[in-house]
């Protein structure tokens, strides 16, 4: 079976083509391409501009993907699209494209939960069977464990997502959004040394990030590090008697990462202790961060377990994960009739009935 | 993936010289609980160690460990002073510099509570009811129910005392309640005794709060815990609330808030 997956819940437009061989061989990625809408430094991506970007690119990407995969339209079994969660306007433009292809080619539609897409792709790539999943991206932050046909949310953010916190701090510092604000923060953080005091907000299994963002933004303002025209060379720290000087931009990025990642590792560890699992799978855009992977690795090692993570091809939003999760659902008989092929900004991970797992 | 058997981190200092050495009881995500002795070999004590977390930045790690262990100890000390049934604090070290490599972990030494965890008491009771398979007469059945009701009221009473003292437990489950009783060794198939004081343990997530919302959530967590672990006993949960009312004057407001907390659906949908 072959499926096309269309993803566009945020600023990435992804098209992927997935093959599940009929003889039971492992699934194959035939094509996985992406085009990202990059906003200028100091700005986020607005829904209307992002939707315009997706509309302009979706046909080109589908054509390119079919060419790359060497498949013709007849070979395709179903068209999978992101039903949610995500930004309304970008989701809609991709859903319209999926409907159009479905009517044009006479193929069935499969609406996919974005979070489940990430989880299923992570499981496929890493081969980890029943991990505790940490899903961290620009729009979502959830600790998930599978139990009786649902991906259950053990802990999550109470306000903004962890990636959103990083992205917005990148905006404060006017760090480039190319290739991704979080990536540039990670590179800058490698030069940081001094840990500044930031709030640490874990509430039971849940986390909160908005207060930390406000605190670190406040520090940037206090030390005059925000805004345009600042780079790392211009501010050299002047250490005081205790060796603590005025923090640099790098120090703030470093402290922000250390604090919020500790919170994520802590809640993940609690979930592992609770369900008795030894494996962790990190998915979502923030999952590319090597410091987060490293911290999670140390925690898992101390528990006698291991951590699984994927690289940017599969961590960052992509079309192939939608095709993968869609195809799993399709093979159990799941279809999305045209009249139900809507999309929604709010779509809980545990709303999906996972028929394809025991 | 390494399959090495798990070795707990080395014990912090005075406990490396304890004979017999402390025995590990449970390992949570946050802390290890040991049984050890205090001052003389006849006085058992509970030792809670918070090992340092190597994944965290050392400064952040020290700050969090110190904050949490002190928070726990402060809550316990306050509750002992208010006469609530909780283990007394015997000693603590929040720096945790006593280990062989200087980071054995912060620790808290507490009074040992002899008795059965309430979860086990209920499990045995449910097993007993199941095993008797309806062969109990009406009178015996009523006596059994009366026992459960009594224990439930005891639980409500201690939770009321806790809230009266201005402390929120944060993790009220039947695993964190001990029935202080001499009758520890009941054979299987016998109905467990349910007399004795109920003692609250594990204040790792506790805090001081005077908001009715926090108190209502505390009760709600307990109610949910009964629903998921002791379905047979859940129908007597009303008794917990009765006991709570008797021991805490501000109960009416909290119970009203509890209604709202119950009515709340699942968490609001999360986007961006």
From Swiss-Prot, chain A:
Subcellular location: Cytoplasm; Nucleus
Cofactor annotation: a divalent metal cation
Signal peptide: none
Amino acids binding substrate: 135-139, 167, 182, 186, 289
A single MF term (Gene Ontology): N(6)-L-threonylcarbamoyladenine synthase activity
Catalytic activity line of the entry: L-threonylcarbamoyladenylate + adenosine(37) in tRNA = N(6)-L-threonylcarbamoyladenosine(37) in tRNA + AMP + H(+)
Positions of a divalent metal cation binding: 114, 118, 135, 317
Keyword Cytoplasm on entry: yes
Cysteines paired by S-S bonds: none
EC number(s) given by UniProt: 2.3.1.234
Pfam families: TsaD
Family: Belongs to the KAE1 / TsaD family.
Subunit structure, interactors included: Component of the EKC/KEOPS complex composed of at least bud32, cgi121, gon7, kae1 and pcc1; the whole complex dimerizes.
Protein name as catalogued: tRNA N6-adenosine threonylcarbamoyltransferase
Organism: Aspergillus oryzae (strain ATCC 42149 / RIB 40)
Swiss-Prot record, chain B:
The enzyme's E.C. designation: 3.6.-.-, 2.7.11.1
Compartments where found: Cytoplasm; Nucleus; Chromosome, Telomere
Record domain Protein kinase: where: 19-272
GO cellular component: chromosome, telomeric region; cytosol; EKC/KEOPS complex; nucleus
Keywords from the named record: Activator, ATP-binding, Chromosome, Cytoplasm, Hydrolase, Kinase, Nucleotide-binding, Nucleus, Phosphoprotein, Serine/threonine-protein kinase, Telomere, Transcription, Transcription regulation, Transferase, tRNA processing
Any one Gene Ontology BP term: tRNA processing
Disulfide bonds: none
Pfam families: Kdo
Gene Ontology molecular function terms on file: ATP binding; hydrolase activity; protein serine kinase activity; protein serine/threonine kinase activity
Annotated region described as Disordered, given as residue ranges: 1-22
Chief location of this protein within or outside the cell: cytoplasm
General function of this protein: Component of the EKC/KEOPS complex that is required for the formation of a threonylcarbamoyl group on adenosine at position 37 (t(6)A37) in tRNAs that read codons beginning with adenine. The complex is probably involved in the transfer of the threonylcarbamoyl moiety of threonylcarbamoyl-AMP (TC-AMP) to the N6 group of A37. BUD32 has ATPase activity in the context of the EKC/KEOPS complex and likely plays a supporting role to the catalytic subunit KAE1. The EKC/KEOPS complex also promotes both telomere uncapping and telomere elongation.
Protein's name in the database: EKC/KEOPS complex subunit bud32
Organism: Aspergillus oryzae (strain ATCC 42149 / RIB 40) (Yellow koji mold)
Name of the encoding gene: bud32
């Amino acid at each position: 079976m072959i499926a096309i997956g269309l993803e566009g819940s945020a600023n990435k437009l992804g098209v992927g083509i997935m093959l599940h061989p009929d003889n039971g061989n492992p699934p194959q990625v035939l094509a996985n391409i992406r085009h990202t809408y990059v906003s200028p430094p100091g700005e986020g991506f607005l829904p209307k501009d992002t939707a315009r970007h997706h509309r302009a690119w979706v046909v080109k990407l589908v054509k390119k993907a079919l060419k790359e995969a060497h498949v013709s339209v007849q070979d395709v079994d179903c068209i999978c699209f992101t039903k949610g969660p995500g930004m309304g306007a970008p989701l809609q433009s991709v859903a319209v494209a999926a409907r159009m292809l479905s009517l044009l080619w006479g193929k069935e539609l499969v609406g996919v939960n974005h979070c489940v897409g990430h989880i299923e792709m992570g499981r496929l790539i890493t081969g980890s069977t029943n991990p505790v999943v940490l899903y961290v991206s620009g729009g979502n932050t959830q600790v998930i464990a599978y139990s009786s046909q649902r991906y259950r949310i053990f802990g999550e953010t109470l306000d903004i997502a962890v990636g959103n916190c990083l992205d917005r701090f990148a905006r404060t510092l006017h760090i480039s959004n190319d290739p991704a604000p979080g990536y540039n923060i990670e590179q800058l953080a490698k030069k940081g040394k001094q840990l500044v005091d930031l709030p640490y907000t874990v509430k039971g299994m849940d986390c909160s990030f908005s207060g930390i963002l406000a605190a670190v933004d406040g520090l940037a303002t206090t030390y005059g590090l925000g805004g345009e025209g600042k780079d790392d060379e211009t501010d050299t720290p002047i250490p005081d008697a205790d060796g603590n000087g005025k923090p640099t931009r790098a120090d703030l990025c470093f402290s922000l990462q250390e604090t919020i990642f500790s919170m994520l590792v802590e809640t993940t560890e609690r979930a592992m202790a609770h369900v008795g699992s030894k494996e962790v799978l990190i998915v979502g855009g923030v999952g590319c961060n090597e410091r987060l992977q490293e911290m999670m690795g140390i925690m898992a090692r101390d528990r006698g377990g291991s951590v699984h993570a994927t690289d940017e091809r599969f961590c960052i939003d992509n079309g192939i994960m939608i095709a993968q999760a869609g195809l799993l659902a399709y093979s159990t008989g799941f279809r999305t009739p045209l009249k139900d092929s809507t999309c929604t900004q709010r779509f809980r991970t545990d709303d999906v009935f996972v028929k394809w797992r025991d | 993936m390494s399959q090495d058997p798990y070795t707990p981190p080395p014990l912090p200092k005075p406990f490396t010289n304890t004979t017999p050495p402390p025995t590990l009881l449970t390992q949570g995500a946050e802390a290890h609980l040991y049984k050890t002795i205090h001052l003389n070999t006849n006085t058992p004590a509970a030792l809670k160690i918070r090992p340092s977390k190597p994944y965290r930045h050392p400064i952040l790690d020290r700050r969090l460990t110190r904050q949490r262990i002190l928070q726990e100890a402060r809550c316990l000390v306050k509750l002992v002073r208010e006469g609530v049934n909780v283990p007394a604090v015997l000693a603590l070290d929040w720096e945790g510099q006593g280990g062989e490599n200087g980071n054995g972990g912060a620790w808290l030494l507490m009074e040992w509570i002899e008795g059965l965890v309430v979860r086990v008491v209920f499990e045995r009771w449910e097993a007993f009811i199941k095993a008797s398979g309806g062969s109990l007469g009406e009178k015996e059945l009523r006596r059994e129910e009366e026992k459960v009701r009594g224990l439930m009221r005891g639980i409500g009473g201690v939770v009321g005392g806790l809230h009266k003292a201005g402390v929120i437990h944060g993790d009220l489950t039947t695993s964190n309640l001990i029935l202080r009783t001499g009758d520890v060794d009941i054979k299987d198939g016998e109905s467990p005794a349910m007399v004795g004081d109920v003692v609250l343990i594990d204040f790792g997530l506790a805090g001081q709060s005077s908001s009715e919302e926090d108190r209502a959530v505390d009760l709600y967590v307990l109610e949910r815990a009964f629903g998921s672990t002791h379905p047979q006993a859940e129908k007597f949960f009303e008794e917990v609330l009765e006991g709570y009312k008797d021991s805490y004057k501000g109960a009416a407001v909290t119970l009203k808030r509890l209604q709202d907390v119950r009515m709340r659906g699942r968490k609001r949908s999360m986007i961006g």
